Amino acid sequence: MAYPTTNLTGLIGFAKAAKVTGGTGGKVVTVNSLADFKSAVSGSAKTIVVLGSSLKTSALTKVVFGSNKTIVGSFGGANVLTNIHLRAESNSSNVIFQNLVFKHDVAIKDNDDIQLYLNYGKGYWVDHCSWPGHTWSDNDGSLDKLIYIGEKADYITISNCLFSNHKYGCIFGHPADDNNSAYNGYPRLTICHNYYENIQVRAPGLMRYGYFHVFNNYVNKFQLAFTVAQNANVISERNVFGSGAEKKGMVDDKGNGSTFTDNGSSPAAVASKSPAAKWTASSNYSYSLMTTAAAQSWVVSNAGAQNSALKFPS
């Protein structure tokens, strides 16, 4: 079964700064069962773990992964993890997640029900993955999110991904507004070339404590986009806000020790309380910006898991 072999092509941002390699150069293991999947992603041996078929469980099932892994879905639809939640552990680091589809049942909706949960380790790249979501309503009681990156996880990039059809989107940083200085600076996270469609709040995310560089993303059908909470340091560049922007919910600024700067987004993302950022992304890595029009076109055509080939911004 064919699968993406682009390896480190397209690596960008803080993940590139950390020299993430995943399982590059290691053995290739194709898995077709949950038991084989659990075994292949564990430990520290350099491994490219290929989903040879989609995997589904009837109940929420947590799979802990180790380090030095590339976890990649095959083309042709053999790349779906349903009700399977990937979790870091204290020894996790240097992992690539690519061309995966994360699905979950509507009934799995508690606060900590999050399909990709990164709370330990340095160096992760989440690329060309999809979270298709499900139907939801304002009064359905759901508290689950799509992805969490926080605590001491660090040097991470989310690129070319699709997040859609969910009440809550993404949550980043130590998940409390308790001014806990132990978590200041975590995570360093790049969020670029992603497509957020019909996410009510937290797309691109609720941000706390870390350094967040967010550029060339398209957010459509939303109520609140950025939620800037405790001690977040956010740089937004040339993002596009579609339906929902007329309600001026681009930045939910809590004014709680954070900084926020927007450069050229359409329409502008304006923080009402937080002062300008005091750091620059370019001091950490090099990158190129698309125009907002080009960024919107790019993500609509190329973001998310793919059936035949992965494309990357030039």
Curated annotation (Swiss-Prot):
The organism's place on the tree of life at top rank: Bacteria
Q: Has the keyword Protein transport been applied to this entry?
A: no
Name the protein family: Belongs to the polysaccharide lyase 1 family.
Record keywords: Lyase included?
yes
Q: What is this protein called?
A: Pectin lyase
Q: Which key words are in the record?
A: Lyase
Q: Which gene encodes it?
A: pnl
**Extra notes?**
In most stains, pnl production is accompanied by cell lysis and production of a bacteriocin.
The record's active-site residues are R202
The cross-references to Pfam families, in alphabetical order and at most eight, read: Pectate_lyase_4 (PF00544)
Q: What induces it?
A: By DNA-damaging agents such as nalidixic acid, mitomycin C or UV light.
Q: Which GO terms describe its molecular function?
A: pectate lyase activity; pectin lyase activity
Q: Which reaction does it catalyse?
A: Eliminative cleavage of (1->4)-alpha-D-galacturonan methyl ester to give oligosaccharides with 4-deoxy-6-O-methyl-alpha-D-galact-4-enuronosyl groups at their non-reducing ends
Q: What is its EC number?
A: 4.2.2.10
